[in-house]
Regions:
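N-terminal nucleic-acid-engaging modules of covalent nucleotidyltransferase systems
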Residues: 1-224
Length: 224
C-alpha cells in the first residue's frame, strides 16, 4: 500500500499532466505486475463491490476514538469526506502492515463473504497498521468511493510512455472486458484478450451531418 499511497499523493498534489504521467511511469517501472493490473482496473472503473456500509465503518471509528456522534459529524462537516475524516481521527498506528497493493485489493474482494465480526476485526487491524494517508486510501477503496483526478487518457499516455505501445492500441486493450485474475500485465497491454468479432466492429470514423442536399451528392450507385 505504501507505493500506491505515494503514487496517489504525487498525482493529487499537481495539476500538471506531465507530472502525473511521470508519477505513473515511475509506479509502472517499480511495482509488481499484479499491482499494475489492479491499478489499471481501479482507474478504469473495475472496482470491487463495497463489502462494508460506510455507516458501519463510521460506528467502528467512533468506538475506537470514543468520540460522540455530534463531534464526529462536526468533524465530517469540516473535512468534507467520510474516509478522510476517519483517517484523521483514528489514533496513530501501533505497527506496520507489509502488504502489496494487490494483496490489499484481494482482501477487500474476499471480505464480502466474511461475517460481520470478521469484517470488523479486519478493518480494526488494518487501521492500526496504516499511516493516515494509507488509511484514507484504504477507506475509499473499501467504501467503494475511490476517486482521483486522473483521466483515462492520462493513464493511457503513461502506459504508452512506459511500454512504447501506441496509445490508441492501449486504450482499446484496457477499456474492454478483461479479468485481472486470468491475464498477465504484458498480455493486457498487448491486447491478447480482445476478441476481434466481425459482428461487433469498432467505429472507424466520426459521423458528421451532410453539408449538401442528397440530390447534390450524386447517384447512390456510384458510392462504394
Amino acid at each position: 500500500m505504501i507505493n500506491f499511497s505515494k503514487l496517489i499523493t504525487a498525482v493529487e498534489i499537481t495539476n500538471k499532466t506531465n507530472d502525473k504521467i511521470a508519477a505513473f511511469v515511475d509506479y509502472f517501472t517499480h511495482a509488481p505486475d499484479k499491482d499494475k493490473l489492479w491499478l489499471i482496473a481501479i482507474f478504469t472503473g473495475k472496482r470491487p463491490k463495497r463489502p462494508i456500509p460506510s455507516g458501519v465503518m463510521r460506528k467502528w471509528c467512533m468506538d475506537i476514538t470514543n468520540i460522540p456522534e455530534w463531534l464526529f459529524l462536526e468533524s465530517y462537516s469540516t473535512v468534507g469526506d467520510l474516509g478522510e475524516t476517519m483517517a484523521l481521527l483514528l489514533p496513530e498506528p501501533t505497527h506496520q502492515i507489509e502488504k502489496s497493493f494487490s494483496e490489499w485489493m484481494q482482501d477487500i474482494v474476499e471480505l464480502k463473504a466474511k461475517t460481520d465480526e470478521e469484517k470488523e476485526a479486519y478493518v480494526r487491524y488494518a487501521w492500526s497498521g496504516l499511516e493516515a494517508q494509507e488509511r484514507f486510501i484504504f477507506n475509499k477503496l473499501i467504501g467503494g468511493s475511490f476517486r482521483v483526478g486522473v483521466s483515462k487518457k492520462t493513464l493511457v499516455n503513461a502506459l504508452a510512455k512506459y511500454s512504447g505501445i501506441e496509445a490508441n492500441q492501449l486504450m482499446h486493450s484496457i477499456i474492454g472486458n478483461w479479468d485481472l485474475n486470468a491475464i498477465s500485465f504484458e498480455a493486457l497491454l498487448q491486447g491478447e484478450h480482445i476478441n476481434y468479432d466481425n459482428s461487433k466492429p469498432y467505429p472507424f470514423c466520426l459521423a458528421y451531418a451532410l453539408e449538401k442536399e442528397l440530390d447534390a451528392l450524386g447517384s447512390i450507385k456510384d458510392w462504394q
